[in-house]
Amino acid sequence: LKQKRKRHRLFGKMIGLCAGFSLLFATILIPGQALAEKQLAAPLRFDFGPGDVADGYTQVTAKDAYTPERGYGFTDLSKVNEENRGGSDAIRSDFVRVQGSSFVVNLPPADYTLSLIAGDTAGNTNITVKAESIVKVEPTAKTAGQFVEAGFELALIDGQLELYFSGDEAKINALVITPNKARTAGEHPSVYLAGDSTVQTYKSSMKPQAGWGQMIAPFFTNETIFVNRSIGGRSTKTFLVQGRLDDILRNIRPGDYLFIQFGHNDAAINNQERYVSPADYKVYLKTYIQGATQRGAIPVLITPVGRRDYDAASASFRISFPEYVQAMKETASETGVALINLSQLSVAYYDTLGLEGTLPLFLHLEPGVFPAFPDGVKDDTHFQEYGAEQIARLVAQGVRDLNIPLSSSVKTENLQ
């Protein structure tokens, strides 16, 4: 039940643009444009509390439940109350106290800057703020008369901003939502990599461990810029809730690429923080795809690279995480997004080398040879530099075969 509630919070929100926006936006949307092209023409300003309303702000009280018609409001009024301390400052003299509930606003998918004021002239404040499940305001405490003034950016994907407020005394005074200026294409495309430890770039102190993302640039022309945001231990879920996808989407430009390879940690059923079922894996992948395409970027799905998992009976290597490989292939088919089947490519490559021949690819190291691994290691998941380079070659080969604009940037002579 707990997992179902969590999934409802993450997935129950609107996916894509709704059939129409509420009356809240009727005067600020650019008339005559297709709905998908509409953007906020001016900031939205909310003044929380029952007292006087600041000029240019929309009042939000503890009685304002979210409705589609209103387009904003609280999701659970039982966890919301309000106070008015009085005074001449319309913003800071009153507030709405929120204890474990969300304030949601229907917005066009885009990038925004949010500015929040939280505090109380006569009492303490203790507040944490999550935006789209990402912690944007860490736990912060203020005494009477002090106010939290926080600003942060957010890449909105699903058409409804959700701000979740927690803390013993989360007192909201004001919120301003400002649309960011749309980015334009760069002179040359950048390729953003979103993935796990098999993709990430490692510090030199970790030699000889490497991910294929740090070895891929030589297979492409010099104009191609790779931005590797991959990091170990992440699944499609944790990469998102930790704000790593958000960081990519707030920087990616039209014409850029987003390469997506997850699966190793999504399948970790004994680690519920990371674990994502194959069905939910597809939901998360579609969120990545939607976020990229909304910003004019081109997503490319990459099935999880194979582990060194040998089947002696068939004298061949097994497909790693087959349910996730299939789920990603289905996602590519359902969305029309390009797919590189690195799972298949890597396992086929391992088969040409055999059990012993694959040892130099993976982190199988003797004790005392490398400072990062003084006791040695036998790791059939992660790569040495040579192995990472060979996997990068397979990815580049996959890009070449996709027949997308980036394909022309592959140095074919380096694939031999």
Task: Describe each PLM feature range.
Residues G49-G51, S166, A194-T198, Y202, ...:
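Active-site-proximal beta-strand/loop segments in catalytic clefts of secreted hydrolases
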Residues F48, L163, N180-S230, L245-L258:
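Serine-esterase "nucleophile elbow" of acetyl-processing enzymes
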Residues Q200-P208, S230-Q242, A268-S277:
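Acidic/histidine-rich helix-loop elements
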Residues L1-F11:
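N-terminal secretory signal peptides that target proteins for export/translocation
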Residues R9-L24:
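Sec-dependent N-terminal signal peptides
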Residues F25-Q39:
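Sec-dependent signal peptide cleavage junction
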Residues R244-E389, R393-T412:
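Alpha-helical cap/lid subdomain in secreted, periplasmic
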Residues E37-Y202:
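Compositionally biased, intrinsically disordered or flexible polar/acidic segments
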